[in-house]
From Swiss-Prot:
The keyword Metal-binding applies. Pfam families: NifU. Transmembrane segments: none annotated. This is Fe/S biogenesis protein NfuA. Its cofactor is [4Fe-4S] cluster. Homodimer. Gene3D superfamilies: Fe-S cluster assembly (FSCA) (3.30.300.130), HesB-like domain (2.60.300.12). The lineage of its organism: Bacteria, Pseudomonadati, Pseudomonadota, Gammaproteobacteria, Lysobacterales. The keyword Protein transport does not apply.
Amino acid sequence: MIQISDKAQTYFRKLIEREGVPGMGVRLSAVDAGTPRADAKLEFAEPADLSGDEWAIDCDGFTLYVVAASVPWMDGAEIDYVTQSTGNQQLTIKAPKIKGEAPAESASMVECVRWVVENEINPQLASHGGRVAVQEVSAEGVVLLRFGGGCHGCGMADVTLKQGIEKTLMGRVPGVIAVRDATDHATGDAPYIPRDSAA
């Protein structure tokens, strides 16, 4: 399930000993699991902090508690304490399932489109403060999207749609034949590039 290296165990044990609280352990949880924003959270946990449904992993000198709801997302996780090329030491957590898994080949076109939008397209648009939401996926394979944030009203939305989003969706999701914009860009209040400024 979860692998915690000897170096990481030694690191945690020293920190816990410094705290001097009887029964203190380390709690591991997944934050925003199943999304591109997913992250792992480690924190000290005194016995009174525990809810009682955590999974307990006995380590050398302490217990690692995994929040019950986070267990599926942490399956296969590796916790290590590594020396970087700069000589600094750092705790690392690799949790391959924390952001979710791509839909199976048998998944519907809608599931596949939503996955690609949330895990590939929106993280790229976020650099401009933008995002897209899937409004509809027709049986014919036409995807209808609604732009938001910095993309709502942006003068480059058409280029983003055709050269970025449509190309990505058609290349990654079998059956997608076109991507259309359902956004009323005239109502955008903070576009990344105002429509009248686009070349």
